[in-house]
Design a protein with these regions (language model features):
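Short basic helix-loop element that most often maps to the first helix and adjoining turn
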Residues: 10-23, 85-86
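Residues in the recognition helix of alpha-helical DNA-binding motifs
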Residues: 13, 27, 38
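Recognition helix of helix-turn-helix/homeodomain-like DNA-binding domains
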Residues: 30-47
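DNA major-groove recognition helix of helix-turn-helix/homeodomain DNA-binding modules
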Residues: 49-66
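Helix-turn-helix/homeodomain-like alpha-helical modules used for DNA recognition
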Residues: 64-88
Length: 88
């Protein structure tokens, strides 16, 4: 099962890809008020499972990878793509 996104991860992901709350709302088809409300809390975002899935898909589609808390803390990063792979 995929761990829920935290508000800190959501804010950090938007910052990495330089999206506004409106950009994320449009990409995820989730209301901008829902995006803003989700980002002001600490911890897991208080949205429906369907909205969280839509937000995750939009951010992952923009190249974001979510990092679970594995002792080093949760976070986000750019997903490794073909362009970043070392050439042989």
């Amino acid at each position: 099962m995929t761990k829920k996104i935290s508000s800190a991860q959501m804010r950090a992901a938007r910052a990495l890809i330089r999206w506004t709350a409106l950009d994320l709302a449009r990409a995820s088809k989730v209301g901008v008020a829902t995006i803003r409300r989700a980002e002001v809390v600490d911890g897991e975002i208080p949205v429906t499972l369907a909205n969280e899935a839509a937000i995750r898909r939009a951010l992952e589609g923009a190249g974001i990878e979510f990092i679970e808390n594995n002792g080093g803390g949760e976070g986000v990063r750019f997903r490794k793509t073909q362009a970043f792979k070392k050439r042989k």
